[in-house]
Amino acid sequence: MKLMHLSDLHLGKRVNGFSMIADQQFVLEQILDLAAQEQPEAILLCGDIYDKTVPSAEAVELFDEFLSRLAELAPVCIISGNHDSAERLAFGGRLLQKARVHVSPVYDGTVSAVELSDEFGPVQIHLLPFLKTAHVRRCFPDAEMETTTDAIRVALSGIDLADGKRHVLLAHQFVTGSERCESEEKSIGDSDNVASSVFDGFDYVALGHLHGPQRAGADHIRYCGTMLKYSFSEANHHKSVTFAQLGEKGNLQITTRPLKAQRDLKMLRGTYEELMAREFYLGTDLPESYLHITLTDEEDVPEALNRLGTVYPYIMKLSYDNTRTRMRQNPLEAQAEPENSPLELFDLLYEKQNNRKMDREQQEYLTKMIQSIWEDSL
């Protein structure tokens, strides 16, 4: 059974003020073409369909068109991610089932499943929406769970993985040891980390949440990554669609098909004169790419953004890196990169004020306090 694995569409996303709708539509057409070529038996959408819990009208319209055409090619299984509203995404779910679209309902203590079959027998596809410990604790108040790993283990405990069937899981969590990008939502310390061992027994685990395609602790546990580059930390990514081919139980093959963006997202560095030299950009895709330009001139270039924009009209970010900017950089700002979690930022502030880092006991206490506040707000 061939499965097409997608996640983190983030429809309606804006990157540095630029709308990605046209770029998303361009790549979604490629995905539809790939689905028609590869003819998968099921298509898995593993969360973060939208970029916001209340998506824009144009994002909803784009997904409606994409989903309608996708469901004509194969059954579609969808779970909600941390950027989605589980309630809004699940609206009309029972009606959608008649059109071969299966959406994870709001979590109520059970994990919904879809059963498909091929020449090797049945395949159970389990739909686990994005969960925090608080969501699971509400449904299992007497269960012991200190970590998100405990919570996910409890949530999956009702699935019989010893029935001889092949089992596929859709999930939207951060698996410990995986590589993050700056465009992803940060957790408090390691509070949302999930050990890959909770997925033991599944034949394939289709993950969403992280933007870089990667295995997560084992070959059968995988993130497919985003279809587009959504931050400059992804500038070197090669975006693709993942296909998982399930044979008889225990037999799994993974392949990928590349995706090409309408506009690439790149980082440029150099002096103003270097970047504006015709021989530098002629014959390249730089004038049509989204760019973060870092000028290394020692003096600010007057009207730099406007002047650079005559050659590079899609500049998302302009910054300087020279002796002056490095000297005036605040020590905390120098360390507080966009990928720092809230706990890491507290740790940096504590170190700046006290000339030492928090000890383990202080970190654990702070993590529990912040986690408790976040859970109370859910």
Q: What do the PLM-derived regions correspond to, one by one?
A:
Residues 16, 49-67, 80-99, 105, ...:
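Metal-dependent catalytic neighborhoods of phosphoester/phosphodiester hydrolases
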Residues 37, 42, 246-378:
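Accessory, non-catalytic peripheral segments of nucleic-acid enzymes
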Residues 40-58, 75-87, 167, 173-190:
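Active-site neighborhood of divalent metal-dependent phosphoester/pyrophosphate hydrolases
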